[in-house]
Amino acid sequence: SGDLPIVLLRIGDLNRIDLVKQVLQAHAYWRMKGLTVDLVIVNDDFSGYRAVLQDQILGLINAGPEAHIIDKPGGVFVRRAEELSEEDRVLFQTVARVLFTDSAETLLEQVERRAVAERLPKGLVPVMQPAAEPAQPLAQRERIFCNGLGGFTPDGHEYVITLEPGQSTPAPWVNVIASPYIGTVVSESGSAYTWVENAHEFRLTTWHNDPLSDSSGETIYIRDEETGEFWSPTPLPACGRSGYVCRHGFGYSVFEHDQAGISSELYTYVAMDAPVKFVVVKLHNHSGRPRRLSLTGYWELVLGEWRHANLMHIVTETDPHSGALFARNDFGRECADRVVFAQVSEQERTVTGNRTEFIGRNGALSRPAALRRERLSGRTGAGLDPCAAIQTHIELAVEQEREIVFTFGAAKHAEEAHYFIQRFSGPAGARQALETVWGYWNHTLGAVHVETPDPTLNVLTNGWLIYQTLSSRLWGRSGYYQSGGAYGFRDQLQDTMALIHTTPWLAREQLIRCAERQFNQGDVQHWWHPPNGQGVRTHFSDDYLWLAYATCRYILATGDTGVLDESVHFLEGRELNPGEEAYYDHPQRSNETASLYEHCVRAIKHGLRFGEHQLPLMGCGDWNDGMNLVGGEGKGESVWLAWFLYENLQLFAGLARSRGDKVFAELCTEQASQLRSNIETSAWDGDWYRRAWFDDGTPLGSSDNDECKIDSISQSWAVISNGGDPARARQAMAAVDKRLVRRDAQLIQLLDPPFDKSDLEPGYIKGYVPGVRENGGQYTHAAIWATTAFAMLGDKERAWELFAMLNPINRGSRPEEIERYKVEPYVMSADIYAAAPHTGRGGWTWYTGAAGWMYRLSVETLLGLKREGDELRIAPCVPDDWESYKIHYRYRDTFYHITIQCGGEKSDYVTRVTMDGAVVNGAGLIPLLDDRQEHHVEVMLG
């Protein structure tokens, strides 16, 4: 299959049968040492003796220790050449890591054969010594919520990190920069990896995922051609003698450094409309003398999923038209026809496609061998340790400034690569692309702008939450700690609900995209890889319901009922076998199509499957993937899913009624009423709602359990769904406050006590250390739901207290806080540890659905801004000591400047709304009209 390394022996000479014996002995030795490879022996004998040779080969195998692994992974495969097509013979030779033949050479001679050594360029001879200079302290900058390492600019649009030589952040503090075409993750050290379209299937450079070393497969070097001294304009890999400044912004990152009289400013960003990444280096010579410098760009090529699986297939060349370095991987699963290119804006350059030449034997990017030579060799081609490296030389007069542009990307073919190079590789094209980035994010993030007495809320809500949701979750589908690339059915549906105010068309697109991943039976792919759609079919019990839920929420907010009539294909694939939890496959598009409305109907009907307590079946997990063994046998039931299904039925009943589908509307209403009754009858534990029942009927989330006595989401959704008995719902949330809110650690646990030593076997959640991630840590997604529930109950004090706990700025605004929290204080983290000695430490960041839900909590639940078709509703839950706050809202091309005047203590209700001086109503509704004017609205609370 190619999953394991292949050693190929081609033999046609019966007299060289000793080669077969030696290779079999070697293969047995490798297996004994744990080195698993496929040994392929091809019988090249086309004479009348080919059967004799075949028998002798098989006889040697059967007489030795390899007999039991013929045609098995890691075993021996014997094939006659005459049975193989020419394409297969070429393929075997191409993918084999080692090729032996029955030539005149012995096996030892073939093993010891060496390629002719390439002549490398001459070593660089310095003409002067580097001047001694004291390290200049970094200039002080105005920053808010500064923790000693980083803080926000006063407008909150950049997070500025300052690092003195040898200093580092407690964990990588990154920026996830993405567009629909390309993305890159850049850390404060300068480490980066880049992908095109799918961060898992088509990585251009290596994803290291090593937060300790923060390794990188991309870097830029500056070299003084007179002294030979070199450094990187980023803190890694070749740290200079003075400090660095890193500025993470919306769609870009900037690195500032000053060394040897040369100040540098490196901008990195991606094009919004093309698969092109930019690294623009601005240099200023303030040394008082003319300077000769070189700049070198380096990229460790992957062109697929993993470097080790693709490096031998990558072929590089110098493009004769542009001088750019091209790379191809004809065996790449998602990139076989693509051309990857690296280019520099200067005409004079040298290149290499050989990583071994660049780094050197036992070398490292901190001290690459290539920077000890005058230039790069120009060597490209096949069979190399592949990379893309470009070096250019420049001269700087006294006080002169220069801008050098490195572009890196992928094209469908060479002609498109030429177009991208011509369009983007010069300073003008790069500048235009950067201005487009600035313009896009300023426009998108400016759709809702709030001014409140809480400056941390302002900073987070006015940019970072939507930026995290759109750049990392929807477009990038990647972060530093996870390079997923796939769409999660439930994941991006939840994310796009947060985009209703800023980019509602993206929410609409996601509804259609997800409906296309639904099978005829109503279930869906749990996740899938674009563009081809390979993914997993599972028994997860909540995925498909998110389609109906998100559709209802989208229509309620936008009034766009036309989306329900969009015609969408189903998928066709085999159904899961009994006892089968999931399978990975590439399902085909069905000939059957239906409206989005019908897709939602099938999803809801598929969810109407109940267990012994007449509650919905858990399957191999509901929202909590880690509880995959609770209902694996098809009998376990989920209480949280019951609340979620109830909410779906209530919402969709109204939608069905508005479409004239009275039959389904009545079915939804009847099922919702019965489900609510069943929950109250069976799921109430005395002080809170249970979480689930195992297949054998054992309750989970009950006071009878030794572990996981209480789980927060069964309580919070009793409120969010409006389905719980009001008195019980309040009692359940009081239990959450008492048992799961850890004020000493400023976190909100998902469940408690964590799974550890009891007989309960809920699934892989128990494999997490107690107090980590879902197993009793703060799982931020669920913690936001708990906060939302308190707000919906009108408990303003509790809701704002928990919001402050959730706000990452509050975890990293002082040195002692960031030392404990460690991760980025400007974006949401998926989880926070709740176990000593790591209590309060952040888990993985960026790639988490917590960002979208946090935005909805901030804007919709707490500040009370909800869009309802062509109206805005103001229904806030704000602290009693607030006098007023403002929301600037853009509706298409029209701005509404809304001031909410709080009437003092217990100002919970809207008493009057005026627009442009005229009273509109007292119900908290603001009519929306796209007249391209600016409207001033005042909302009075009392």
Regions of interest found by a model, annotated:
Residues 1-493, 505-517, 553-558, 658, ...:
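Anionic coordination/interaction segments
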Residues 30, 499-507, 511-614, 638-646, ...:
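Aromatic-rich carbohydrate-recognition surfaces in CAZymes
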Residues 447-450, 454-457, 468-478, 485-492, ...:
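Aromatic-lined, polymer-binding surfaces characteristic
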Residues 449-463, 509, 514-515, 519, ...:
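Active-site acid/base region of carbohydrate-active enzymes
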Residues 481-485, 490, 525-542, 570-591, ...:
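Carbohydrate-binding/catalytic loop surfaces
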Residues 867-898:
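Surface beta-strand/loop "capping" patches
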Residues 914-918:
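Short strand-turn-strand beta-turns centered on an Asx-Gly dipeptide
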